[in-house]
């Protein structure tokens, strides 16, 4: 994928969001579907990358950067007690919360402020599509691991050789920093780690946080 096409895709997402208003797609209990930028199939496939059981009764799940909340509500549907956080109060999350009669706890909280003393600990933490929006990705991963007792599910945009032909970035633990709007014309995209860098971040974060044992951090990689 060329630099231009990568940026065009992000801009297409933004135009679609401006038109549709929803980032996530939903299917309501009565069968009504709400169309968002991301299809239901795409959302389900993202979750399927991780070893998350269909039956989550008795489990606590944290969704970091919940946005419209599909992943939060899906975890609740599977029986989990769910806490969702984001850095802003998203009215679409609250609207869907009401439509579903949900009991998910929704909090406006920065990932950097996560701590067991503040939110408790969770069997599963979802950290999906958030890392590249952060100035301090390793610190954020350490905060995620500090509240995880079993599985931290991580996916992120990664910088690959197709973005920088001839650079062999895939296997090197390097990262691009976007000072302004270099990535897709958006000022909230800060970093582009290579696949090797993402894996190294996850290993480091998991080993740095020693508050629990048996933790697994499972990263997956998306090019855009």
Labelled PLM ranges:
Residues 1-31:
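N-terminal, positively charged/glycine-rich alpha-helical extensions of SAM-dependent methyltransferases
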Residues 111-116, 122, 126-127, 135-224:
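S-adenosyl-L-methionine-dependent methyltransferase catalytic module, highlighting the catalytic core
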Residues 36-57:
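Conserved alpha-helix/loop element of class I SAM-dependent methyltransferases that forms part
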Residues 70-113:
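Class I SAM-dependent methyltransferase SAM/SAH-binding core
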Residues 131:
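Conserved SAM-binding site of S-adenosyl-L-methionine-dependent methyltransferases, i.e.
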Residues 59-67:
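Conserved class I S-adenosyl-L-methionine
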């Amino acid at each position: 994928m060329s630099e231009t096409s990568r940026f065009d895709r992000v801009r297409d997402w933004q135009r679609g969001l401006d038109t549709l208003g929803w980032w996530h797609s939903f299917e309501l209990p009565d069968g009504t579907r709400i169309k968002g930028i991301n299809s239901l199939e795409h959302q389900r496939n993202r979750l399927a990358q991780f070893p998350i059981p269909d039956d989550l009764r008795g489990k606590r799940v944290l969704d970091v950067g919940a946005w419209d909340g599909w992943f939060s509500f899906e975890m609740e549907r599977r029986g989990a007690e769910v806490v969702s956080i984001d850095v802003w109060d998203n009215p679409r999350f609250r609207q869907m919360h009401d439509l579903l009669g949900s009991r998910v706890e929704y909090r406006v909280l920065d990932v950097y402020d996560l701590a067991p003393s503040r939110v408790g600990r969770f069997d599963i933490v979802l950290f999906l599509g958030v890392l590249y929006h952060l100035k301090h990705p390793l610190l954020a991963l350490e905060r995620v691991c500090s509240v995880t007792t079993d599985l931290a599910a991580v996916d992120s945009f990664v910088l690959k050789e197709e973005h920088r032909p001839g650079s062999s970035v895939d296997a090197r633990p390097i990262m691009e920093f976007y000072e302004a709007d270099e990535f897709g014309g958006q000022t909230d995209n800060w970093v582009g780690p290579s696949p090797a860098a993402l894996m190294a971040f996850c290993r480091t974060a998991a080993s740095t946080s020693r508050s629990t044992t048996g933790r697994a951090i499972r990263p997956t990689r998306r090019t855009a």
